[in-house]
Each structure stands twice: as C-alpha cells, then as structure tokens.
C-alpha cells in the first residue's frame, strides 16, 4: 500500500489550504492516481485498521439498489438495531433537513447503480462483460445531474469502468471527484477491490488491476495529526480475500447478506487511528 502512503505524502508536501462545505478546512491537491495489482494481495490498508465489515456492508447495500439506512445496517451487522454506520452522519445532518425520514437518503448510489432512468447498470455491466468483453462501454455512473439535489450526499466516487484483457483478466478503474484521504480513500480502495473480485466471479474472469483517479484530494485539518502518524508506519503484507460461494447477483444478495460472509485472511494491520468524519 505504498501507493496510498504516497498520496498522503503528496498532499502533506504539496497541498494548499482550502475552505470546504463542512467548515472543517482541508489541505488539498488536484489530481491523484494509484494502481494496485490484485494478484499480489487484497489492498486493505495495513498502516491502520480498516473497517472491513463496513466496507462489505456498504458495497452489498449499493449492489442491492437500496438507499435506506435500515437496509445498510442489515447488510453490515445482520440486523437493524440502530447501529452507527458511515452514512448515519449524512442522514442526520443532511437527509432529515431535506425532509427525508425513516432512514431514507434520497437517490444515492444504489438507486443510480440499479435504476438510473430505468436502467439497471449493474446487470447490464455483468451481461456486457460476459457477452461483449472487448466492449468500451462497460461503465457505471452514479452522477445523475437531474437528481443531485435530491441526494443526502452527491456521489464522491461517481463512476467506474471495466476492461477485459485477451487472457481473461478483469481490470477496474474508478473516478472520484472528492477524496477524503484519511477516512475515505482506504475505504474506497477496499470497496472497489471487492467489487472487482465480485464482478470477476460473476463473469468467469480473473481480477487483475484496480486503478484510482482522484480530483480534489484532501486531508481535513483535524485529521493531520493522525495522518502524520500513519505515514511513519511501515506497511505490512497484504491479506487474501476469501469470499462465499455465489452464482449470480441474486444469490450474492439473498444468501450472503451479511458482511461476515467475506473474510480477509492474514490481515495484520497496525493499530486503529480514529478521527471525526466531516459531513
């Protein structure tokens, strides 16, 4: 995960102070890039502990098409008992003031992935990868301009594209307009790595490269102390992803609906580093 630490270092050394929507303030650069070879291990950050269960739960929630906080809790914890999730601040700080209730967040990621203007982008992507692997339209977008003002949070990672090599490997590249380097980016890396593995399994391909392209890449001012500690730590060996058996998207979502169905074997990170999420 040296690629991730390099991004942190670039922001520290090259970033400029910026005001932001949350009022916290950031140090920011524009444009960031990283490439991970998934054959070398699963890119879970090791210089602090990754909230793995939350990564899995959120991705399954996206893939299900749900935009409700209650469903996110079920995917993450196996039950809804009002647990805190990474979407809880967005619900409490934005969604409620927009008039939403009962856990609704508006037409966020899941809605766009599974019903963008009536199109199920995920099913179309899977079919395209199977039937037209060399196609150049293997792309999913969450940036629905007509519905941005209805979302509790417009998408930070707003699109991804897939590529199939001649020898049966699957690559995935995602694009992100706003990159919270300390809390968000490790989560996003793991999420899209998991998505690449899931898509590869559903299409009979082998996961290969995961590529990240970021826009406004920033460290919040109140995260800087933790980041400076993190970049001093030496990365440890990457874990191996162990997934449950599933034959299609329905099987994945209906029979493996809890995050504990997915494991990181050999994951031995440095201790957790805590910080407040700006919403």
Curated annotation (Swiss-Prot):
The keyword Disulfide bond does not apply. The keyword Nucleotide-binding does not apply. One of its GO terms (molecular function) is thymidylate synthase activity. Gene3D superfamilies: Thymidylate synthase/dCMP hydroxymethylase domain. GO terms for biological process: DNA replication; dTMP biosynthetic process; methylation; viral DNA genome replication. (6R)-5,10-methylene-5,6,7,8-tetrahydrofolate binds at residue 180. It catalyses: dUMP + (6R)-5,10-methylene-5,6,7,8-tetrahydrofolate = 7,8-dihydrofolate + dTMP. The active site is at 156 (nucleophile). DUMP binds at residues 21, 136-137, 177-180, 188, 218-220. Its EC number is 2.1.1.45. Keywords: DNA replication, Early protein, Methyltransferase, Transferase, Viral DNA replication. Induction: Expressed in the early phase of the viral replicative cycle. It is an enzyme of class 2 (transferase). It comes from the Viruses. CDD domains: TS_Pyrimidine_HMase. Pfam families: Thymidylat_synt. Sythesizes the thymine necessary for the viral DNA replication. Belongs to the thymidylate synthase family. This is Probable thymidylate synthase. It comes from Escherichia phage T5 (Enterobacteria phage T5). The lineage of its organism: Viruses, Duplodnaviria, Heunggongvirae, Uroviricota, Caudoviricetes.
């Amino acid at each position: 995960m040296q690629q991730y630490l390099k991004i942190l270092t670039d922001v520290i050394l090259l970033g400029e102070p910026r005001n932001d929507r949350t009022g916290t303030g950031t140090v920011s650069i524009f444009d960031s890039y990283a490439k991970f070879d998934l054959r070398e291990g699963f890119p879970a950050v090791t210089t602090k502990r990754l909230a793995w269960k939350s990564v899995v739960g959120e991705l399954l929630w996206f893939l299900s098409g749900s935009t409700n906080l209650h469903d996110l809790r079920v995917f993450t914890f196996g039950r809804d008992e009002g647990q805190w999730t990474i979407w809880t601040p967005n619900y409490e700080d934005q969604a409620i003031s927009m008039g939403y209730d009962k856990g609704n967040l508006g037409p966020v990621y899941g809605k766009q992935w599974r019903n963008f203007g009536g199109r199920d982008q995920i099913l179309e992507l899977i079919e395209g990868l199977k039937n037209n692997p060399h196609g150049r339209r293997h792309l999913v977008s969450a940036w629905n301009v007509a519905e941005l003002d209805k979302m509790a949070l417009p998408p930070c990672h707003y699109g991804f594209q897939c590529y199939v090599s001649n020898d049966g490997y699957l690559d995935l590249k995602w694009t992100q307009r706003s990159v919270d380097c300390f809390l968000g980016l490790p989560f996003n890396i793991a999420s899209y790595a998991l998505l690449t593995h899931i898509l590869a399994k559903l299409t009979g391909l082998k996961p290969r490269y995961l590529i990240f392209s970021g826009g406004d890449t920033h460290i919040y001012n109140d995260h800087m102390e933790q980041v400076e500690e993190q970049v001093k730590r030496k990365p440890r060996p990457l874990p191996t992803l162990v997934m449950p058996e599933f034959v299609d998207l329905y099987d994945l979502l209906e029979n493996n609906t809890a995050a504990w169905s997915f494991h990181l074997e050999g994951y031995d990170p440095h201790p957790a580093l805590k910080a407040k999420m700006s919403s």
